[in-house]
Design a protein with these regions (language model features):
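Short hydrophobic/aromatic beta-strand micro-patches
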Residues: 25, 70-74
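A generic structural micro-feature
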Residues: 16, 63-65, 90
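Short secondary-structure transition/capping segments
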Residues: 67-70, 99-113
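Short, glycine- and small/hydrophobic-rich beta-strand elements in well-ordered beta-sheets
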Residues: 47-70, 99
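An amphipathic, aromatic/His-enriched active-site/gating alpha helix that lines ligand/cofactor pockets
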Residues: 75-105
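Short S/T/G/P-rich N-terminal loop/turn motif that feeds into the first structured element of a domain
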Residues: 5-53, 105-125
Length: 125
C-alpha cells in the first residue's frame, strides 16, 4: 500500500526541465522578405528539433530593441541549450544570447526557504 501511495505521489509531481531564454539578432542580410523569414524559421526549427528532440519550446516573440526575437524553451541540460543556441546562430546567421531562467512561482518558493536577514535583490530598489 505504501509503495502505491509513493508511486502516485511521484507521478503527480510536476517535474520540469530547466528553462532558458534565447535572444536572437539576425544578420541584416539574413532575411529580405516575409517569405524568406518564414522559410528561415521553418528550417531553423526543423534543424533544432532534429538535433535536440528533447527540448520543449514554450514561446517565441518578436521584440523591439537590440534583439529581434525572444524564445523561451526547456532543455534537459545546459549543453543542450548551448546546442540550440548554436544551431540558431549558425543556421540563421544570427547573434544569440542565452540565459538560464527560473519561473516566478518557483523563484518565490526558493526565496521563502532562505534564512531570515537575507536581502533579496530584485532590481527595484
Amino acid at each position: 500500500m505504501a509503495l502505491r501511495h509513493w508511486r502516485a505521489a511521484f507521478e503527480a509531481m510536476e517535474v520540469h526541465m530547466p528553462t532558458f531564454v534565447l535572444l536572437t539578432r539576425l544578420a541584416p542580410d539574413a532575411v529580405r522578405s516575409p517569405q524568406a523569414l518564414e522559410r528561415l524559421e521553418r528550417e531553423a526549427m526543423r534543424r533544432v528539433h532534429a538535433e535536440c528532440p528533447d527540448i520543449e519550446w514554450l514561446n517565441n516573440c518578436a521584440v523591439l530593441g537590440p534583439y529581434d526575437y525572444l524564445d523561451i524553451f526547456r532543455a534537459p541540460d545546459v549543453e543542450t541549450a548551448a546546442k540550440v543556441a548554436t544551431l540558431i546562430r549558425v543556421h540563421g546567421r544570427a547573434q544569440t544570447e542565452t540565459w538560464a531562467a527560473v519561473e516566478w512561482d518557483r523563484y518565490k518558493e526558493l526565496v521563502r526557504g532562505l534564512p531570515d536577514g537575507v536581502i533579496v535583490a530584485t532590481g527595484q530598489e
